Amino acid sequence: NNYCKIKCLKGGVHTACKYGSLKPNCGNKIVVSYGLTKEEKQDILKEHNDFRQKIARGLETRGNPGPQPPAKNMKNLVWNDELAYVAQVWANQCQYGHDTCRDVAKYPVGQNVALTGSTADKYDNPVKLVKMWEDEVKDYNPKKKFSENNFNKIGHYTQMVWANTKEIGCGSIKYIQNEWHKHYLVCNYGPSGNFGNEELYQTK
């Protein structure tokens, strides 16, 4: 798979071309470990699908205002190893934020990132980081269009529950920076959500 030939929707050089391997590139940060276990992958996937079903069934009471309306076209996500590989390459740069070009041959790819830190020698489990994205639902106004909501406050939530997204793959790295124990999680989603002229899902 030659990532250097992929032309991303948003331009730029593909992450898997630019960095080319899973070797961590973290400067003076001390890398403790990287990658997700099979169990962690299953947990992340289950957390996404449980939350998508909660939304679909109209059980999410939070919002600005809540509750969130039920969905009629919400499907379960499946894990995709290629998305996970590209997410892991980006996580291994230890740069908090979004990369520019992560699309794969079959579709454009969206992304959620989360970073937590502790002065104690411990790291939050990935599901806790995923729940931080879910919590953004408290700022979502379902009475407005997606494009009229404040994207900076709700973009992780909306990608999680974007109905047309079918697949997910994530990467993770744990490192120490200035005595802070940090856990950085990157999840890539395909096809990408958060297209301004579309809605999250069809309401019932």
From Swiss-Prot:
One of its GO terms (cellular component) is extracellular region. Disulfide bonds join 4-17, 8-101, 26-94, 170-187. It is found in: Secreted. Expressed by the venom gland. Keywords: Allergen, Disulfide bond, Secreted. SUPFAM superfamilies: PR-1-like. Residues 45-189 form the SCP domain. It comes from the Eukaryota. InterPro entries: Allrgn_V5/Tpx1_CS, CAP_dom, CAP_sf, CRISP-related, V5_allergen-like. Gene3D superfamilies: CAP. Its main location: secreted. Belongs to the CRISP family. Venom allergen 5-like subfamily. This is Venom allergen 5.
